[in-house]
Amino acid sequence: MSTHDRSLYLKYAEALSHPGDFSSNATSFFAQDADINVVHPFNQLTGADAYLNEFLLPLQHSFKGLYRRDDIFMAGEFEGQNWISSTGYYVGQFVRDWIGLKATKTLSYIRYGEFHRIEKGQAVESYIYLDIPELMIACN
């Protein structure tokens, strides 16, 4: 695992750690044809545009002041492939309904875990897990 691959992810993570426009960093982090697998109801997305338009921007629209807090970060090689992984929470005030869940108008935390395979300085294969059931419980 090169330090370039690590710094690439850390730049992406840093951009998500503050409320604002995440678009430019997402488009530079993911390869144009990246295979991005997000939990249901998002499922398989192809490329940064789909990731932004179908997952990240709607999430940001529903959670005012959304930012992401990374708690654990790991990077290394497995079977000749470079992988980066992190876990933590998306945090924001749940102000608009999202994926069928009614907005609570309260500060909400969504636990996440991500795994990204890196090639040529971009994520080409990703698995993104969100603890939506925990959010459902918080919403009643």
Model-derived features: where do they sit?
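C-terminal and inter-domain tail/linker signature
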Residues: 1-140
